């Protein structure tokens, strides 16, 4: 396996031309490139929205964009969105510092990637309308080309890391008399692993639980009399 570090904006083009088998880039960047690709796996990081924004205090909606100047680093995404709404506008491509273009008189509104909104607020801007697109880092492949066996191995390994990030491994000791109730709280994927302890009438239990539910699960186990409750991160998991 060879890895190439390229400009995120160019990755979809390399994949579409068959130069690369798989690529990791932002969904927004891939779509703006107008390259032909298939999204294979969302990776759950680098999340953002692509929004229109205007000076704070001004009331805007997308119907008012007809004939206006719109500054953006993603002209193809903007043109496609405007076309969907039957709007013609002057789309001005800028490679950076899009937020300041209104203050400098270059544009009436902007269209830009918004993560936390801090940069927009610092420039006195506020988003309006529905998001043009919701983006995150994704794995892409060339359209119409089947994933090879070697590529599937790479994808499975990535998916294993994503699975591991959403689960914790819970270990605890509990009285045999409370095992059924505890197992109902920690069912795992196909059932918890139960092992006898030297302490008579007690067992050790291990199960995977969704990370988002970990505190509630541990609270419930405590109520059931469980002891030595431990939660461990997973590095990789195959389901």
Language-model features, listed with the residues they occupy:
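Short, structured active-site "lid" loops
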Residues: 1-19
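Small-molecule-sensing regulatory modules
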Residues: 1, 5, 25-38, 44-45, ...
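Signature of uroporphyrinogen-III synthase
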Residues: 13, 49-53
């Amino acid at each position: 396996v060879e890895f190439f570090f390229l400009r995120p904006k160019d990755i979809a083009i390399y994949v579409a031309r068959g130069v690369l088998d798989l690529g990791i880039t932002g969904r927004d960047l891939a779509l703006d490139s107008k390259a032909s690709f298939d999204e294979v796996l969302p990776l759950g990081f680098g999340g953002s929205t692509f929004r229109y924004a205007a000076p704070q205090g001004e009331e805007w909606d997308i119907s008012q964009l007809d004939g206006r100047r719109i500054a953006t680093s993603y002209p193809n995404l903007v043109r496609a969105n405007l076309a969907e709404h039957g709007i013609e506008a002057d789309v001005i491509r800028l490679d950076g510092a899009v937020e300041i273009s209104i203050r400098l008189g270059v544009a009436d509104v902007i269209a830009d990637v918004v993560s936390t909104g801090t940069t927009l607020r610092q420039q006195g801007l506020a988003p309006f309308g529905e998001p043009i697109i919701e983006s995150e880092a994704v794995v892409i492949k060339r359209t119409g080309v089947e994933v090879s066996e070697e590529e599937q191995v790479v994808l499975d390994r990535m998916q294993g890391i994503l699975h591991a990030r959403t689960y914790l491994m819970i270990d605890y000791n509990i009285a045999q008399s409370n095992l059924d109730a505890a197992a109902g709280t920690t069912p795992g994927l196909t059932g918890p692993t139960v092992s006898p302890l030297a302490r008579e009438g007690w067992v050790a239990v291990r199960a995977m639980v969704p990370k988002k539910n970990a505190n509630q699960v541990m609270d419930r186990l405590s109520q059931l009399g469980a002891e030595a409750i431990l939660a461990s991160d997973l590095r990789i998991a195959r389901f």
